[in-house]
């Protein structure tokens, strides 16, 4: 094992996560229909600051992400600063790492803290699948540019006459990989077939996720980390995730048809995460700054790792690649963990990664490691459910997982937790957290 790389400042301070918050997560075109991601981000950051009672000028940086970006607000981070009453001099920039975007935001704030350029910052992400940048065809886009430069009405009419009716149809955002044309669900189908994951196994994991999430809400475990929201016309509160199906049975899952490979597939809408709207954020600072402000941190960021693999086959294996690296940098093994939380993009993807984490052959032949990362104990795995149940607003999921894991570690008396996710483009992310 290589030497551990502790995340500390030049003064030896640990990187503290003092609080975290998220909106409830809403299925596409439901509670947050018509609410853009930038407004969801303002909601959560404004409420996070109000609850923390931290002086507004104590936050020196805000790093925020959005995967489905809107052209009118390309720097969502700066718009959040300007829209929440934060100090206008607060540095703010936006990041994007697909489904691992808020992992990246957290890493960036941590690096600023370690460099000593700031002592406190906010990291997070927001996405809306209900407010989308609906585009136009390439043919229409080109004509519109040319029309803007045309000098006469006749020239403009000539340009428009070149268009066909199909060129006028709106173009929704792409749901496929730019480089391969494969949809995420196509990759999940690849993984199910490669690793022999059955429909029954996928449905069982999805059912488990919903049952655990419903139980977490019923026991009040999420109340402190999920805010109540009000949206126009501001009459009814929206306070709980609306995708969770606590009353579902395994028989219900079996009724659905495959969503991607219609003839021979096993990936369905029920064993996949749904399109979702929501936002999440965390406040981070140096350990000494937290003490100065009289704050007890939720926990600490011990290590992180980002990885990348090829996109043509089984590209959602990011957790199997990034987890051993994050553990190594933390100076830990799988056995040292109290909790292990993996983003459930698809049940097939989740089960494939769990299989490979325990595979000696994968460790030796693919990762070049002497031994497997380790089997994940079911008693430690996604104990409060995962993304299949909660939903997945792309840029917000990492911050949700971090906050949720730290709260659960605190309830268990402390320990180490690892959160990990796959992401489009063959990317992976993992972070080791510590709570006392």
UniProtKB/Swiss-Prot annotation:
InterPro entries: Ac-CoA_C-AcTrfase_FadI, Thiolase, Thiolase-like, Thiolase_acyl_enz_int_AS, Thiolase_AS, Thiolase_C, Thiolase_CS, Thiolase_N
Enzyme Commission number(s) of this protein: 2.3.1.16
NCBIfam families linked: AcCoA-C-Actrans (TIGR01930), FadI (TIGR02446), PRK08963.1 (NF006516)
Organism: Salmonella agona (strain SL483)
Keyword entries, A-Z: Acyltransferase, Cytoplasm, Fatty acid metabolism, Lipid degradation, Lipid metabolism, Transferase
One of the record's GO cellular component terms: cytosol
Family label: Belongs to the thiolase-like superfamily. Thiolase family.
Catalytic reactions of this protein: an acyl-CoA + acetyl-CoA = a 3-oxoacyl-CoA + CoA
Assembly behavior: Heterotetramer of two alpha chains (FadJ) and two beta chains (FadI).
Protein name (Swiss-Prot/TrEMBL): 3-ketoacyl-CoA thiolase
PANTHER family membership: ACETYL-COA ACETYLTRANSFERASE, CYTOSOLIC, ACETYL-COA C-ACYLTRANSFERASE
PROSITE patterns: THIOLASE_1, THIOLASE_2, THIOLASE_3
Function comment: Catalyzes the final step of fatty acid oxidation in which acetyl-CoA is released and the CoA ester of a fatty acid two carbons shorter is formed.
Location in or out of the cell: Cytoplasm
GO molecular function: acetyl-CoA C-acyltransferase activity
Pathway connected to this protein: Lipid metabolism; fatty acid beta-oxidation
Record field: transmembrane: none
